[in-house]
Amino acid sequence: MRIVVVAAFLFLASCAASKKISKQQQYMNDQYRELKNALNEAEVSIIKDSIKVIFSYGVLFETSSDQLKDEIKPAFQRFAGVLNKFDKTKVLITGHTDNTGSPDYNRELSEKRAISARQLLNSYQVRDDRMFTWGMGERVPVAANNTEGGRARNRRVEFVILYNVKE
């Protein structure tokens, strides 16, 4: 009899966990669709249980600058609107650079770029406690650094949106 009760309990517990996972997946899928609709100037993709957002290359930063260009700010405002609507998520912001400058300089600059993006999203009411920054320097290029176009593509920030498992 105990075995039947334990088995029934485990079955019910696994059903509850499945529903919770399904709810989280639905939440993330809904957010993904809204981001795709709101952000024409960004590449939005689902990677496992997260959403990755990369804005069009070459429009975010000048060489050696951590200040976002003005033309990207309306897109960040729309991005913030979706993030605010789906507030059960956390956002990892990674900054990147081209290979101009020393590795130490680039790591520091990439962290400043991530912080700059965080501050802009924060100015659009995205809660600061939902965002985390990381500077990658020149370590993860998306293009060759031997042309100005390639270097411009590498001067970027990327966003990884994760469901807050504490919810």
Model-found features: residue ranges?
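Pro/Ala/Gly-rich low-complexity, hydrophilic intrinsically disordered segments
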Residues: 24-29
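Sec-dependent signal peptide recognition
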Residues: 1-7
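Extracytoplasmic
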Residues: 39, 48-50, 56, 78, ...
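Periplasmic OmpA-like peptidoglycan-binding domain that tethers envelope proteins to the cell wall
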Residues: 66, 96-167
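Bacterial signal peptide processing site
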Residues: 16-20
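Glycine- and acidic-rich phosphate- and metal-coordinating loops
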Residues: 54-56, 91-96
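C-terminal motif of bacterial Sec signal peptides marking the signal peptidase cleavage site
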Residues: 11-14
